[in-house]
Amino acid sequence: MSIDIDWERATSGPDGELLAERIRSFIHDKFQQMVLPRFIRSVQVTSFNFGTIPPELEIRDLTDPFPDFYEDGDEDLSVSSEEQSPMREQADRYRERIDSWQTNSPGGLEVQMSGRMGFGHPLQLAPDEDGSRLHPLRSPINLGDINPYLFPRSGTPGIPGGTSNLGYFMPLSGLSGSQTPLRAVTRGNPFSGGWPDSPLENESRMGHGQGPPRRRSEVNVDAIQSRPSTVNTGNTLFSRGSVSTGDPRHSHSSQTVLANNPGQAPEANDSPVSAVPPLSGTPPRRMREQKAEDFQVFCRTKYAGNISLSLTAEILLDYPMPSFVGLPLKLNITGLTFDAVAVLAYIRRRIHFCFLSPEDAYALIGPETGGGGGDTMEPNSLRRKNLSLLRKIRVESEIGRKENGKQALKNVGKVEKFVLEQVRRIFEEEFVYPSFWTFLV
């Protein structure tokens, strides 16, 4: 199904001029960021115009949007509250409470834990509306309590624990049961305690054989088996300045101190591993909820118009010495031709727009739109030819100032080739999937 576009109405008027200025500014910024050849200096994009010839559009398919379009980025934090999920709102409340507590509490974190709270009481915050609580920070691992048979190292005078390549925050709760010192487990010795001066370490040493039963800070190594724990490096409320969007009530780790009752012992079947979510090297992506009214359109786009782009630069001559003289350059792109598949997705007041590469278009739409000009092409031929979405770009260049109505130089191929390569690169990096543009409507 073909679509007719009122090109003049869409590209003229105040809105059209504003859009053209934004595109000009965007291309200008991209040229400022790229590395220029030695003989070109100070590239400036002076004007951009949509032209008078509209593109030809043909709808090919209607599907569900790509999953990447549902990703909730940092730029979406200003969206109205009705679009935010309850989990995200709860995470934002936790972040605000943490920032408020750090701002209003005098002294550092150690003063809060040891001076005001005392050694016998874990750090507690007021429960939220749903009854969930924030977890206290844990002390670093005492490397001196490591079994020497597991990590052999030579002792060094003056350095407690010897010289080991073991990381400072490397967790020890994931050691297998076959390598665990059983006497330490049966006697209730905390295998992964904190530093000697930490409140949790002092409390665990004072409580042997005289007081409360074992708390969650004392890890059951046999229950974990050989799976290493990553709680020290991953799922913390202060990591990377952001809060995980998972439900805080289900984010308890094996080293979490009981905040409800410090003297209450965990149940026998309380497995710390079952509550630890799988962690990866990158934080999980926040995704919006999919709705039935979301849709995506695949549209074949053909364009052979008179779009124009003007650039100015300076060419340096190295004779008789480097950068001896600079000649002004004016370069005009007077039109281009391309044939591609455009993707237009509508998701709750947002429009996501991008183009597909020839290989992706062949896989999703078919061989009819895989190559330019409607030719049927196989994927191997597409990779071999390395086709670009921009088929032809018409360029006119003028070098030097006019003297007696004549130009000093015209249509210098080396300069034109560089500019065309950069225009193609900017277009493919910014407009071809997985890159896409989002517009609020």
UniProtKB/Swiss-Prot annotation:
Cell compartment(s), UniProt: Mitochondrion outer membrane; Endoplasmic reticulum membrane
Occurrences of domain SMP-LTD (ranges): 1-441
UniProt keyword list: Endoplasmic reticulum, Lipid transport, Lipid-binding, Membrane, Mitochondrion, Mitochondrion outer membrane, Transport
GO cellular component assignments: endoplasmic reticulum membrane; ERMES complex
Molecular function via GO: lipid binding
Disulfide bonds: none
Keyword match Membrane: yes
Compositionally skewed regions (Polar residues) per UniProt: 226-245, 253-263
Topology versus the membrane: Peripheral membrane protein
Coiled coil (residue ranges): none
GO biological process: mitochondrial genome maintenance; mitochondrion-endoplasmic reticulum membrane tethering; phospholipid transport; protein insertion into mitochondrial outer membrane
Statement: the UniProt record of this protein carries the keyword Hydrolase: no
Chain residue ranges for the region called Disordered: 70-89, 180-289
Signal peptide extent: none
Family: Belongs to the MDM12 family.
Function in brief: Component of the ERMES/MDM complex, which serves as a molecular tether to connect the endoplasmic reticulum (ER) and mitochondria. Components of this complex are involved in the control of mitochondrial shape and protein biogenesis, and function in nonvesicular lipid trafficking between the ER and mitochondria. MDM12 is required for the interaction of the ER-resident membrane protein MMM1 and the outer mitochondrial membrane-resident beta-barrel protein MDM10.
Entry remark concerning the domains of this protein: The SMP-LTD domain is a barrel-like domain that can bind various types of glycerophospholipids in its interior and mediate their transfer between two adjacent bilayers.
Protein name per Swiss-Prot or TrEMBL: Mitochondrial distribution and morphology protein 12
Gene symbol of the encoding locus: MDM12
